[in-house]
Amino acid sequence: MNLLRKSLAVEPDGPAANWGHLFLRVSAGLMIFYIHGLHKLEGWIAYLQHGTPWTLAGEVAGMHVPAPLASAVAATLVQFICSLFIVVGLFTRINAALLACALGGAILQNLLASRDPQLAILYTLVVVTLVFLGGGKYSLDARISSNMETKRKENKA
C-alpha cells in the first residue's frame, strides 16, 4: 500500500520532480544539439570551407523565406547554442522560446518536403514545456537567482 501511495503522490517540488526536470532538460537539450544543431553546423562549415551545397539553405530557399542563407545560419546558431544553454540551465526560458521558434521552422520545413515532422513536433513540445517550467532546481538559473536573492537581502540589511 505504501508503494501505491508513493506512486500517486504529487510533490511538484520534491526530489523526484527535480531530478525528472533535470533529466528532461538535459536529455532534450543534448538531443536537439546533436540531431539539429551539430548536423546543421557541420553543413554550414562544409559550405564555408569547400562551397559544398548546404541542404538546409536550399530547403529554406524552397520555402520562399527572405534571405534564406541568413535564415539558415540563424536557425543553425539558435539550435546549436540555445540547446547547450538549455543543457546547463542558463536563461532556460529565453533559450527554450528561441528554440521553439526555430523548431517551428523545422516542422514547416519537414511538412513542405513531405517528411514526417513528428520528431520536430516532439522537441517543440518539450521546449515549450521548458518555457513554462524554467531551468529547475538543478540549473544555473536557480544558482544565479539564489545568489541574486542573497545579495538583495544583504543590501537591504
Where are these regions (language model features)?
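Perimembrane loop-to-helix junctions flanking transmembrane segments
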Residues: 47-66
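Extended, low-polarity transmembrane helix blocks
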Residues: 1-47, 66-77, 81, 88-157
